[in-house]
Design a protein with these regions (language model features):
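Active-site beta->alpha loop and helix N-cap motifs at the rims of alpha/beta catalytic domains
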Residues: 13-34, 40-136
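Extreme N-terminal starter segment of soluble prokaryotic enzymes
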Residues: 2-11
Length: 136
């Protein structure tokens, strides 16, 4: 019998904080009713940053949901979160921002699935590697 490995398309979805209420409804449907969706697609991650996040790249996101609730939802479905910290103008004095460091500490705690960060700044990348080694 020819057992072929079926390729899977891993989708990386936007709006980690901005679309939290949508994902609270969509994710149960996606995982509990797989027959409604193509079997060759999967959710690789959901990315974003909350409103007023200094390390974000200036996007106009309006998500202000509790980061613990957001993380809990993704853990429930085994989905990786990716924080978008793509601000290209960061300087060393910005690295101590309480909101951003708090988010990193929270998302760094998750063993399974591992969470990641999308960065632009080498300065921020080095900082994150040293202080939050579980983030990829």
């Amino acid at each position: 019998m020819d057992e072929r490995i079926k390729p899977t398309a891993h989708y990386h979805l936007p709006g980690l904080f901005e679309f939290y209420e949508f994902y609270r409804v969509f994710l149960p449907l996606f995982y509990e009713h797989r027959e409604w969706f193509y079997d060759w697609c999967d959710i690789g991650s959901i990315y974003g940053a909350p409103a007023d996040c200094l390390w974000d790249g200036g996007r106009t996101g309006y998500g202000d949901d509790d980061p613990r609730a957001v993380l809990s939802l993704l853990r429930e479905y085994g989905i990786s979160a990716r924080l978008t910290f793509s601000n290209s103008l960061l300087r060393e004095e910005h690295l101590s921002d309480n909101k951003c460091t708090g988010l990193c500490a929270l998302f760094n705690e998750s063993e399974t699935p591992r969470n990641g960060v999308i960065v632009h700044s080498e300065l921020l990348l080095d900082y994150l590697r040293q202080r939050y080694p579980k983030l990829y």
